[in-house]
Amino acid sequence: MKTKNEPKVILELAKESDLPEFQKKLQEAFAIAVIETFGDCEDGPIPSDNDVQESFNAPGAVVYHILQDGKNVGGAVVRINSQTNHNSLDLFYVSPEYHSQGIGLSAWKAIEAQYPDTVLWETVTPYFEKRNINFYVNKCGFHIVEFYNEHHSNPHMHRNGREDDKPLLNDDDFFRFVKIMKKKD
């Protein structure tokens, strides 16, 4: 439901030809917190090119542009499991110039509305992404249910694709969030 101050957004399916630009904008948005926390992105873009490609090509993946007034202001990659209705938000971003305008919440509500049979949504975010943690918990109603770290690894975490396959920027330190939408019958 759209409130008076909530911007209207539209989800538009991304075409295969859109994916390189989508990836670039996603990585630019993700770089902000990395640079604020670590000072740079010396080891390459976050998420890595390989991780983004894996998300684009995962079974059940759907890639959306987030549009406001006809402008591309962000994007999302969701994975939909129509058998279990346990769905995943793999990647989600709002371009930095559109932050703090309610676009993220409007987009998330549009995603929820697109998949009304969802029983559970799941996502992860790095431990240092305070903005994301606030968004998922305090705005969207997710709950933190797990903390992946060197002592408790994420069995589904994409590796960074480098030859040494070492974690990138504490790659293993992620919070896992879930949002239960409805109880199974």
UniProtKB/Swiss-Prot annotation:
Any one Gene Ontology molecular-function term assigned to this protein's record: acyltransferase activity, transferring groups other than amino-acyl groups
This protein's name: Uncharacterized protein YrkN
Gene3D superfamilies associated with the record: 3.40.630.30
Originating species: Bacillus subtilis (strain 168)
Domain N-acetyltransferase: 9-169
InterPro entries: Acyl_CoA_acyltransferase (IPR016181), GNAT_dom (IPR000182)
A UniProt-annotated Pfam family: Acetyltransf_1
